Amino acid sequence: MKEESILKKCDSSSIKHVPSTPLETNCPDKYNPKTWPIRLKVRNVIVISSMTFLNQYGDSVFAPSISNIAEQFHASRTLVTLGATLYTLGILFGNLIFAPLSEQFGRRPIYLIGYSVFALLQIPIALSVNLAMFLVFRFFSGLFGSVGLSNGSGSLADLFEKKDRGKYMVIYFTVLSIGPGIAPIISGFISQSSIGWQWEFWILLILSGFNLFWAFLLLKETYPPVLNRKKFEKYGEIGENEPVALRLTGKQLLIKLLILLSMKKPISILLSQPILICVACTIGSIYGMINLVLIAFSEVWKSSYDFSPGISGLMYISITLGLFSAVFIAMPINQKFYSYLVKRNGGEGEPEFRLPMGFIGITLFEIGILLFGWTARYKIFWFVPTIGSAIMGGGYIMTSNPLNMYVVDSYGIYSASASAGVKIFQLLFGAIFPLFAESLFRRLNYGWGCTLLAFILLACGCSLPILFKYGKQIRNLRPFDPSKY
């Protein structure tokens, strides 16, 4: 392809004679992703975003069919909901394993191997003969499908300078966020058809296989220390202060894997970095709540409004519209405000400049969940609770995107490992909250149940103004040193 030929042509001029100070050249350096042609970067972003989208699509893909699956396997709705919980726990463990492994072997092989297994695992899920088989393979599906989620933000940090990263981070995190909202729209009609809930997973297999084909063709390695290792092995020299990933022996790699599974590294990073604790609590709460609502959403329309499964699935469009509205209206405004703060700060960007939109996002999410809960409680005309769910979806994007970008900007090439600590909280909350959905709304009704959720989020979100005002001082109190982990 054109971009690859440019990289090959410039290889000798930009790499062969690498001094201690980076060489000035107009040619892109194939060992430095930040210098690649924009089209090559965008291709990587599209493939990685698609992987993450389908992983999140799989999270709620069977939500409209929970009752059907429960009936087939002679189980309760809560037990079947474990399929979502275990999937999310699989994503959690995948983040702990695949993010650091990419820092040893590179991003590309981790993406391709993990995603190949994810695609194949849809087969035994669709062919499950009992609930245990369904739940076990759902866990492993989440585990191997997490490669996009665990390494996506790190890949974007590899590809783009901080000043150019914002719009691509918005694309990535938006595609990530809309997956759970789109899946039930399709699955709702499948659940009421005669073809059976299994086709929800056959469709996921087809989509994953198609995306995997393009990943093998288009995805390039982007992790700088691994690229520097390749450069050093080929040319025998690299620039000063350029990080290099060391090759581990089989025994060293096994020890590292055991440490990863113990969660030592991400938990150590999380507990040693106050800003990560604040971000983790906020993102964890809002992610858990959106997962809870997604699981309960279809049942709200069936029980309160007597909608069919297909029409109930269509109601998820309101959440998706809220997500898209936030992307095309709110996030560009946030980027302009970020540029304004950078200009006011003498042209120097700070991670805290990403946060202002988060204040508005949390407020909107709370307004949306209260409006949805109380109007559904009193069975007010169906259009009104959809307004609440749309506001809720927009608030979710406007909160989670700035916070995720804040972590990426704060930790740079180590953002994959830093994000893993945050994702422990996020995914634990996302796994646990849906289990409470049925009992929460049965005991407190939709109005008071959503009010309780709003108060929990309010308590967690109080940290955002503190981070915006004092985040830099807090970061300087406990500087991040990757060698300690």
From Swiss-Prot:
Subcellular location: Membrane
Similarity annotation: Belongs to the major facilitator superfamily. CAR1 family.
Name listed for the protein in its UniProt record: Uncharacterized transporter C1348.05
One Pfam family from the record: MFS_1
Membrane protein topology class: Multi-pass membrane protein
Entry's Gene Ontology BP terms: transmembrane transport
GO MF entries: transmembrane transporter activity
Coiled-coil blocks: none
Keywords: Membrane, Transmembrane, Transmembrane helix, Transport
Transmembrane annotation, as ranges: 79-99, 117-137, 139-159, 170-190, 199-219, 275-295, 313-333, 355-375, 380-400, 421-441, 448-468
InterPro entries xrefs: MFS, MFS_dom, MFS_trans_sf
Record-level GO cellular component terms: membrane
Keyword hit for Zinc: no
Main location: membrane
